[in-house]
Amino acid sequence: MTDEPISERAARHVAAFNDSVRSGDWADFASRFTPDATMRFVGVPAGPFTGREAIADGYAAQPPSDTLTVTRAASSGDVDQLWFAWDSGTGTGTMTVRWSSALISELTVGFD
């Protein structure tokens, strides 16, 4: 993977995340995942979650309170690697997003 501008699919994912943070509605965000998707967090006591419904329930139970901005991106095939900063300035992290067609099949989020 090489650094490059954020892919359109990853930009849509981040926009959907930020919209859900603002609205508190995680159903639309969860619809971006395959029915059997997995989501893991590294560095926080949450998950892992398997399945679209479990992902939506996980976000609803422990919703993020801050939006994020991608600071660096790299893509290779069906994988986008994103580095991000919380907009409040409280930290940074990474997202590895694996795609199956236009839906997310696997999401791993790590916190620095």
Predicted regions located by residue number:
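A solvent-exposed, acidic/Ser-Thr-rich amphipathic alpha-helical stretch
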Residues: D28-S76
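A structural signal for well-ordered alpha-helical scaffolds and beta->alpha junctions
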Residues: A10, V14, R52-I55, T90
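A beta-strand edge to alpha-helix "cap/lid" segment located at domain peripheries
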Residues: T2, A56-D112
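Short, low-complexity N-terminal intrinsically disordered segments enriched in polar/charged residues
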Residues: M1-A27, S31, P35, L103
